[in-house]
UniProtKB/Swiss-Prot annotation:
Source organism: Cereibacter sphaeroides (strain ATCC 17029 / ATH 2.4.9) (Rhodobacter sphaeroides)
EC number: 2.4.1.227
Family of the protein in this entry: Belongs to the glycosyltransferase 28 family. MurG subfamily.
Origin organism lineage: Bacteria, Pseudomonadati, Pseudomonadota, Alphaproteobacteria, Rhodobacterales
UniProt keyword Cell inner membrane, yes or no: yes
Reactions mediated catalytically: di-trans,octa-cis-undecaprenyl diphospho-N-acetyl-alpha-D-muramoyl-L-alanyl-D-glutamyl-meso-2,6-diaminopimeloyl-D-alanyl-D-alanine + UDP-N-acetyl-alpha-D-glucosamine = di-trans,octa-cis-undecaprenyl diphospho-[N-acetyl-alpha-D-glucosaminyl-(1->4)]-N-acetyl-alpha-D-muramoyl-L-alanyl-D-glutamyl-meso-2,6-diaminopimeloyl-D-alanyl-D-alanine + UDP + H(+)
Superkingdom, taxonomy of origin: Bacteria
Bilayer disposition of the protein: Peripheral membrane protein
Pathway: Cell wall biogenesis; peptidoglycan biosynthesis
Binding residues for UDP-N-acetyl-alpha-D-glucosamine: T13, G14, G15, N125, R165, S192, Q293
First-listed, main subcellular location of the protein, grouped into a coarse class: membrane
InterPro entries: GlcNAc_MurG (IPR006009), Glyco_trans_28_C (IPR007235), GlycoTrans_28_N (IPR004276)
The protein, known as: UDP-N-acetylglucosamine--N-acetylmuramyl-(pentapeptide) pyrophosphoryl-undecaprenol N-acetylglucosamine transferase
């Protein structure tokens, strides 16, 4: 009998792809073959997957983007993707199909339903996304990264936590260097696609900090491509040492070296912050579906590991005060780091692996 095959289907943002990568790494170590089904947008985030993972770009679409003609073609594109997935599964039958959300996961999950293959989904947020909500009643297991998670009536969830990449686990519980009179690192991350509001507010907020903090501060700021130039210029005008990029490939290292993190509260970002264990200021994305980013942040905030600032209340003066409070109180910052670490779920990947292997055993 050949090695079992896991088919991972994930959509085109880091929030979907990073947990998928964590599962792929774990299953490869267990001797499984792994394929990733995603679209061209998702493939941009697949560079960190193990090299033995075969990446299949699928045809999918969303009604959320494009004009009337593009929307009219959505069903045809999805149907084409489903037909292609069915044909692929008949050639090389997956032992388990797992979806991590996003429209590009529709073809593989639909094919798994049609062929009655073992199938499951993982939802990273405290509220199911549209695609996961559609498939939740049609899979054998619904794994939840945040608890409690709002689930459709009659659907039971299994709390696994959010898997993180091996690079994050390698930095888990890395010693926290408290703020002090020496070089300090501040990391600003806006999710896999950056955050304009952070680019608008953070540079000015940092520029308002007391000189004794600014003299030692180094900044790594993730920004949208169209914002990189103006954010870089804002830091330059203030005489601040800042590295501004659209995407940092070494976020785990940067988080482990940070005295403070300013971030959106996407599920992957919250998981990374808690497992590495760093004080954070979280600014939930106000337009997130069902306000799921506020739900994601709640655990760290209630654990007194993070400060929550609603987007509507974010301004340079208020943010600057919060940054200064953390960076000028080393004992309090150390306790925030400890609280974050206690909230983390470093075994989330193993819990998810258990569900995959359980479904595979039931099939044999």
């Amino acid at each position: 009998m050949g090695r079992p095959l896991l088919l991972i289907a994930a959509g085109g943002t880091g929030g979907h792809m990073f947990p998928a990568q964590a599962l792929a790494e774990a299953m490869v170590r267990r001797g499984w073959r792994v394929k990733l089904s995603t679209d061209a947008r998702g493939a941009r985030y697949a560079g960190g997957f193990p090299h033995v993972v075969e990446i299949e770009e699928v045809s999918s679409a969303t009604f959320a983007r494009g004009g009337p003609l593009a929307k009219a073609l959505v069903p045809l594109r999805i149907a084409g993707g489903v037909a292609s997935a069915v044909a692929g599964f008949l050639r090389d039958r997956p032992s388990v199909v797992v979806g991590f959300g996003g429209y590009p996961s529709i073809p593989a999950l639909s094919a798994a339903v049609a062929l009655r293959l073992p199938r499951m989904i993982h939802e990273q947020n405290g509220v199911l996304g549209r695609v996961n909500r559609l498939f939740a009643p049609r899979v054998q297991a619904v794994c939840c990264g945040t608890w409690p998670t709002d689930l459709p009536e009659g659907v039971e969830g299994y709390y696994t936590g959010n898997p993180v990449r091996a690079a994050v686990l390698e930095r888990a519980a890395a010693p926290y260097i408290v703020p002090g009179d020496y070089p300090m690192s501040l990391v600003v991350i806006g999710g896999s696609q950056g955050a304009r509001v952070l680019s608008d507010v953070v540079p000015e907020a940092i520029a308002r900090l007391p000189e004794q903090i600014l003299a030692n501060l180094r900044i790594a700021h993730q920004a949208r491509e169209e914002d990189v130039a103006r954010v870089t210029e804002a830091y330059d005008r203030a005489g601040l040492l800042a590295e501004v990029k659209t995407f940092f490939t070494d976020i785990p290292r940067r988080l482990s070296e940070a005295q403070l993190v300013i971030s959106r509260s996407g599920a992957s970002s919250v998981a990374d912050i808690s497992i590495i264990g760093r004080p954070a200021i979280l600014v939930p994305f106000a337009a997130a579906t069902a306000d799921h980013q506020t739900a994601n942040a709640r655990g760290l905030v209630e654990a007194e590991a993070a400060i929550l600032i609603p987007e509507s209340a974010l301004d340079p003066a208020a943010l600057s005060e919060h940054i200064a409070a953390v960076l000028s109180q080393p004992d309090a910052a150390r306790q925030m780091a400890r609280n974050a670490l206690a909230h983390g779920r470093p075994d989330a990947t193993e819990r998810l692996v258990e569900v995959v292997e359980h479904l595979a055993r039931k099939e044999t």
